[in-house]
C-alpha cells in the first residue's frame, strides 16, 4: 500500500517540500506520496487527529504550527523539547513523535562546507528568534563550545543563552558590538528575515573586516545572495545560503521516516531549479 507523507501549514501553496520528497521517492523506487495540507490554526488538533487516523507515515510542520503542534503529539524528542518547536513528526507504533530537524539540518549543511570540525570554531549567531534557537541548541548539542549571539534586543539574546543547559561559552552582544568584533569569528550565521525579498537592501551586519577563511551562512534563500552574503563574498569569505539548510533538514526528515538516505545533491539542484536558479 502506498505510504502517505506530507506537510501542514498556513499558507502552504508555496512549499517546495512536495516536489523535493516526491522526486526522492521516485528516484528510490518507493511507493509513497508527499502532499501539502492547508491547515488553519483553529483546526490544528482535528487535523492532527485526522492524519493519525488515516495512518499517515510522517509529516512536516511549518508556519504557524511549529509550537502549537506540540500539544497534540504523543512524544517529543528531548532536543525538540528544548528548542520549543517541532517541524517533523514520525508515526511509529501508533504514536506521533515530534522532532526538530531545522537545527540539525543546518549543522549538517554547515559541516558540508567546513574543512575543519565545527567544534573547534568560534561562531557568531545573528538573531535570537525561533530559527536562531534551533541552530544554537543544535550547535551546542553537536559539541560546539563557543557561540556568541548578537541581536537588536540584547536581553532576548541573553534569554536564548540562559535557556541552554549544554556547556557553551556564550556572550550576548548588540549588533553594533558584533559589527566591530566580526573579525574574531570563524563562522557568522544570519538567522533573521533581514535582507529577504523584497527588502534586499537591508542587512543586520555590515561586513567589513573578516579574517581569512571565514564562513558566512544566511538561512534566507530568496534572494540566493543576500546583501550580507554579497559583502562577505567580496571579503573572500566562504558563503552559504538557506537552500542547504532547507535541503538537509528535509533529507533528515526523509531518513527518519523511511530509513533511506536520499541524494542530497539531487535534492539541492531540484530546489535551485524550482526557485529559478
Curated annotation (Swiss-Prot):
An MF annotation (GO) of this entry: shikimate 3-dehydrogenase (NADP+) activity
Binding site for shikimate: 15-17, 62, 87, 102, 221
GO biological process: amino acid biosynthetic process; aromatic amino acid family biosynthetic process; chorismate biosynthetic process; shikimate metabolic process
Function summary: Involved in the biosynthesis of the chorismate, which leads to the biosynthesis of aromatic amino acids. Catalyzes the reversible NADPH linked reduction of 3-dehydroshikimate (DHSA) to yield shikimate (SA).
UniProt xrefs under InterPro entries: Aminoacid_DH-like_N_sf (IPR046346), NAD(P)-bd_dom_sf (IPR036291), SDH_C (IPR041121), Shikimate_DH (IPR011342), Shikimate_DH-bd_N (IPR013708), Shikimate_DH_fam (IPR022893), Shikm_DH/Glu-tRNA_Rdtase (IPR006151)
Assigned EC number: 1.1.1.25
Name of this protein: Shikimate dehydrogenase (NADP(+))
A Gene Ontology term for the protein's cellular component: cytosol
Domain of life: Bacteria
Stretches assigned to coiled coil: none
Recorded metabolic or biological pathway in which this protein acts: Metabolic intermediate biosynthesis; chorismate biosynthesis; chorismate from D-erythrose 4-phosphate and phosphoenolpyruvate: step 4/7
Active site per UniProt: 66
Keywords of this entry: Amino-acid biosynthesis, Aromatic amino acid biosynthesis, NADP, Oxidoreductase
Organism ancestry: Bacteria, Bacillati, Bacillota, Bacilli, Bacillales
Family statement drawn from the similarity comment of this UniProt entry: Belongs to the shikimate dehydrogenase family.
Pfam assignment, any one: Shikimate_DH
